[in-house]
């Protein structure tokens, strides 16, 4: 890393927050429930059980690269919304869309929604160590349960424990995901997925900038 690049990244993040700090996800009125918020400055306090995944809260937008075993590599755009209402879970929604070689929209692609949860007592070395859970339902007709752990205060590694496919769902194997907050405060991730030959292969990767929070 070049000298001063860290300071520049912090300065960029501060400048960007002047816009993102005032934003939040839209709400419909007249419900007697705590409002969902993707901005830790607004709405209910984050549940103490979720401190291990606190940096994920926000709305993230950017571009990435996907790999299809049949058609090869392709670029995509993505938005991820991570919100909470004070409960002991984070709400997760991710949508991607295929881009052409010029970065223009082509069609919708992947859509998943679910919840991040934390189990265990958080005591290193105990028999009930802290575990990160991610439960996802996909528009492609599959449901997945990931288990993993926080590698640091701003990175998380997970792997599927269960993959359930509906009658009309796509045929896929298990997956591993690695998420992390990287230089400049962006959210980056990679996903590897088991394909027909039984090997884990690169499937998705992206770097997303904070849009809300």
From Swiss-Prot:
Disulfide bond annotation, renumbered to this chain: none
Motif GXWXGXG, residue numbers: 58-64
Keyword field: Heme, Iron, Isomerase, Metal-binding
Pathway linked to the protein: Nitrogen metabolism
Cofactor details (free text): Binds 1 heme b group per subunit, that coordinates a highly solvent-exposed Fe(III) atom.
Domain of life, per lineage: Bacteria
Enzyme class: isomerase
Pfam families listed in its UniProt record: THAP4_heme-bd
Catalytic activity entry: peroxynitrite = nitrate
GO MF assignments: heme binding; metal ion binding; peroxynitrite isomerase activity
EC number assigned by the record: 5.99.-.-
Cofactor(s) required, per the database record: heme b
Binding positions (heme b): 176, 203
Gene3D superfamilies membership: 2.40.128.20
UniProt domain comment: Forms a 10-stranded antiparallel beta-barrel structure able to accommodate a hydrophobic ligand in its interior. In fact, this fold hosts the heme group, which is located in a wide surface cleft.
Subunit structure: Homodimer.
Family: Belongs to the nitrobindin family.
Biological role stated in the UniProt entry: Heme-binding protein able to scavenge peroxynitrite and to protect free L-tyrosine against peroxynitrite-mediated nitration, by acting as a peroxynitrite isomerase that converts peroxynitrite to nitrate. Therefore, this protein likely plays a role in peroxynitrite sensing and in the detoxification of reactive nitrogen and oxygen species (RNS and ROS, respectively). Is able to bind nitric oxide (NO) in vitro, but may act as a sensor of peroxynitrite levels in vivo.
The protein's name in its UniProt record: Peroxynitrite isomerase 2
Organism in which the protein naturally occurs: Rhodococcus jostii (strain RHA1)
């Amino acid at each position: 890393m070049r000298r001063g690049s860290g300071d520049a990244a912090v300065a960029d993040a501060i400048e960007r927050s002047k816009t993102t700090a005032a934003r939040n996800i839209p709400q419909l009125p007249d419900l007697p429930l705590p409002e969902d918020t993707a901005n830790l400055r607004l709405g209910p306090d984050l549940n103490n059980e979720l401190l291990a995944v606190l940096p994920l809260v926000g709305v993230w937008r950017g571009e990435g690269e996907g790999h299809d075993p049949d058609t090869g590599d392709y670029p995509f755009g993505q938005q991820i919304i991570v919100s909470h209402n004070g409960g002991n879970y984070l709400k997760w929604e991710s949508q991607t869309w295929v881009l052409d070689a010029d970065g223009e929209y082509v069609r919708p692609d992947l859509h998943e929604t679910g919840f991040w949860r934390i189990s265990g007592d958080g005591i290193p070395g105990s028999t009930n160590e802290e575990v990160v859970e991610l439960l996802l339902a996909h528009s492609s007709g599959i449901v997945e349960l990931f288990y993993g752990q926080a590698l640091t205060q701003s990175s998380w590694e997970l792997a599927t424990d269960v993959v359930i496919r509906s009658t009309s769902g796509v045929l896929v194997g298990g997956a591993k995901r690695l998420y992390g907050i990287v230089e400049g405060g962006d959210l980056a991730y990679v996903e590897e997925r088991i394909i027909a030959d039984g090997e884990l292969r690169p499937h998705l990767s992206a770097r997303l900038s904070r849009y809300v929070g």
